[in-house]
Amino acid sequence: MKILTLKARIPVALFLILLSGSAAVAQAPSTGTPTAINTAFVKLFGAVGSFTAKVDTQVLDPYQKEVVRLLMDFATFEGKVRIEINLAQMQSKDLPPSKIAELKESGMERIISLFRPDKKVTYVVYPGIQSYQTLPLAKADNDAFEKGLKLEKTALGKETLDGHDCVKYKVVVKDTNGPVLQAVTWNAADLKDFPLQIEMKEKINTVRMHFTQLRFTKPDPQQFDVPAAYGLMK
């Protein structure tokens, strides 16, 4: 296994920061995980229990100019979430070509995040070096998974997205103490009311997640487990 330098780890931190915006950890630190995919975020998908999709994810500044952009492979199964990205394909001024070269050399450009509320952890997996990290979920997120959350939607209007008639909603996810996540979603009636697009505020920025190549099929359950041959990263 290759020894990872601090420089090689920096883009990984950037990835985690990006995901922290995508699940609105800034809004709800009590329910956030280090990779930010949490029970409140999963609640946005409503009754859709299993699916796979590609996700075009953007971070926009207050002037709606793109700061970061990357594609994700996204899958859910029985409350579990799997996200896979390749940092070498991410567009960001904070990731120059020299950093991409370091990532490829270290074998850490490909990252898989496995949100496992049933095990009360998120696994961050690095297939290139056959290693993984274990990140415990916050107590509040465990409570949300066990006790459930309430989703409230307010219609803002109707728009067409990718040829699908969508209702644009303001969505608030609440636990017993109040709101834990707020978002704007575009839900397609002909796709089981699936949110084809999700926007959330991350401090002064906006995170936009646009879902494409959507398939309502059950992914292979083994995709949500760390391969047995992989070692725990020290």
Regions found by a protein language model. Name each.
Residues 10-20:
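Sec-dependent N-terminal signal peptides
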Residues 157, 162-230:
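Gly/Pro-enriched, hydrophobic low-complexity segments
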Residues 71-144, 202-210:
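An acidic-aromatic
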Residues 2, 18, 22-80, 222, ...:
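N-terminal leader/targeting segments and the immediate start of mature chains
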Residues 46-56, 78-83, 162-170, 192-198:
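Short, hydrophobic/aromatic-rich segments at coil-to-beta transitions
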Residues 60-66, 89-96, 174-181:
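Short, cysteine-centered beta-strand-loop-beta hairpins and adjacent loop/turn segments enriched
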Residues 1-12:
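Bacterial N-terminal signal peptides that target proteins for export
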Residues 32-36, 65-68, 144-155, 209:
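A short, amphipathic edge element
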